[in-house]
Amino acid sequence: MAELACFCYPHLENDSYKFIPFNSLAIKCMLTAKVDKKDQDKFYNSIIYGIAPPPQFKKRYNTNDNSRGMNYETSMFNKVAILICEALNSIRVTQSDVANVLSRVVSVRHLENLVLRKENHQDVLFHSKELLLKAVLIAIGQSKEIETTATAEGGEIVFQNAAFTMWKLTYLDHKLMPILDQNFIEYKITLNEDKPISDICVKELVAELRWQYNRFAVITHGKGHYRVIKYSSVANHADRVFATYKNNAKSGNVTDFNLLDQRIIWQNWYAFTSSMKQGNTLDVCKKLLFQKMKQEKNPFKGLSTDRKMDEVSHVGI
């Protein structure tokens, strides 16, 4: 994750802003600079290489002292920064909006995936600039639309029916902020269209998840798509979702947290997010993740959750 101010800076033209991507040498200069505390939140002028991000965001970049940041000296950083600028320059951002826009925290990996989709000549985003910009605006929180299959970050498609597409995320192969844990495995499920879904499509998805992905929990981050994650990473996702929800509420970026379909979401996660929306503390909410829930009546007749050991999927072992 990183703020948009880590990728570009605003330049006032008439009564709105144009956004310009940073270059890696300007960032490198900023990372070595001694800057007064009162200037930490201001864009840094490298004199030689142009404007650089505010020094307060130093930890967002990979250095000898910090291996958890972005690999900003890669060509992928330039591609992501340019893509963000193209999207922001396609809309009107005024003086009253600019600080709020640049402080928005976005998923670096999501944006790298959109670059990969854009570069794939078999992908619809390669052929449609309009759809590409729409996908980026959704990714950076500048659109109220949800991420559907056409505008999704992408990955490897492992399941699809008339209503849903399930993607295996490919973060292990990334350049900008790769996941280094070789055991990482995670999926995302997007809606093919933002419209009511038939019970038969939901039943098909639930059957697939229970049969092939019974070692995973189905959760949501509240943005209109599902995530399929290992049970061991549930607590980590809960911390992130809770922190983001509280930060958005504090900064006034209040967007409705979409709980999605209770028949698909893991029961404990649904309880956690419902409790969070009611204003409870993190500790109170997280207890619900590890509490034995009363088994709800199966909404789909004939779809059993019981499996013999030799029938259980080995995905995720």
UniProtKB/Swiss-Prot annotation:
Active site: H225 (for ntpase and rtpase activities)
Region named RNA-binding: 205-241
Enzyme Commission numbers on file: 3.6.4.-
InterPro entries: Rota_NS35_C, Rota_NS35_N, Rotavirus_NSP2, Rotavirus_NSP2_C, Rotavirus_NSP2_N
Subcellular location: Host cytoplasm
Location (main, coarse): host cell
Top-level taxon of the source organism: Viruses
Annotated GO MF terms: ATP binding; metal ion binding; nucleoside diphosphate kinase activity; ribonucleoside triphosphate phosphatase activity; RNA binding
Enzyme type, top EC level: hydrolase
UniProt xrefs under SUPFAM superfamilies: Rotavirus NSP2 fragment, C-terminal domain (SSF75347), Rotavirus NSP2 fragment, N-terminal domain (SSF75574)
UniProtKB keywords: ATP-binding, Host cytoplasm, Hydrolase, Magnesium, Metal-binding, Nucleotide-binding, RNA-binding
Chain residues that bind ATP: S107, V108, R109, K188, H221, G222, K223, R227
Disulfide bridge map: none
Biological processes per GO annotation: viral genome replication
Subunit organization: Homooctamer. Interacts with VP1; this interaction is weak. Interacts with NSP5; this interaction leads to up-regulation of NSP5 phosphorylation and formation of viral factories. Interacts with host DCP1A, DCP1B, DDX6, EDC4 and EIF2S1/eIF2-alpha; these interactions are probably part of the sequestration of some host SGs and PBs proteins in viral factories.
HAMAP family registered for this protein in UniProt: ROTA_NSP2
Function in brief: Participates in replication and packaging of the viral genome. Plays a crucial role, together with NSP5, in the formation of virus factories (viroplasms), which are large inclusions in the host cytoplasm where replication intermediates are assembled and viral RNA replication takes place. Displays ssRNA binding, NTPase, RNA triphosphatase (RTPase) and ATP-independent helix-unwinding activities. The unwinding activity may prepare and organize plus-strand RNAs for packaging and replication by removing interfering secondary structures.
Family listed: Belongs to the rotavirus NSP2 family.
Protein name as annotated: Non-structural protein 2
Lineage: Viruses, Riboviria, Orthornavirae, Duplornaviricota, Resentoviricetes
